[in-house]
Amino acid sequence: SYPDGMDVQVYSLNTLKKSYKMTKSLLDREHVTLHIRKNPNIFPALHLIAPRSLFWPNLGLTLDDKLDFILIKKIFEKFKNKKNNFPLKEIIDYLKHNKKLLKINHNVKRK
C-alpha cells in the first residue's frame, strides 16, 4: 500500500498493555507490534489501502541504512524550498520521473 516509512500503526493503550502481558519474548517487547500482528484473532486490524496515486508498497522511505539516508537527503535537497513541507504525492512524482534515484536503496532489506 503506502511506501515503507509513510505508513502508520495506531494501537490503543489497552492493546499495548494486553500484548505486553501476553508475551515474554524480548523481541516482541522491543518491537511491540510484532506480537500484535502475529495474533490477529486476538488483535483484529483495520488496514487502509493507499489511494492509487500513493500506492507504492515496494518503495523504501525509511531510514534504516546509509543508502536510505542518501536517498532521503536527495529528496530533501529537491524540496528544500518548500521548508520541509511537501506531500508524499510530490515525492512519488519526483521519484517516478527520476528512476535512477530508486537504485540508491533498492537492495536494502526491509524488516
Show where each model-derived region lies.
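Cytochrome P450 catalytic domain signature, combining two hallmark sequence patches
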Residues: 26, 80-86
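Residues that recognize and position ribonucleotide moieties
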Residues: 9, 62, 84
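Conserved core of the sugar-phosphate nucleotidyltransferase
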Residues: 1-59, 67, 74, 90-111
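A hydrophobic, small-residue-rich beta->alpha segment in the mid-to-C-terminal subdomain
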Residues: 72, 77-82
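A short, ordered amphipathic alpha-helix with a cationic face
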Residues: 4, 62-63, 80-81
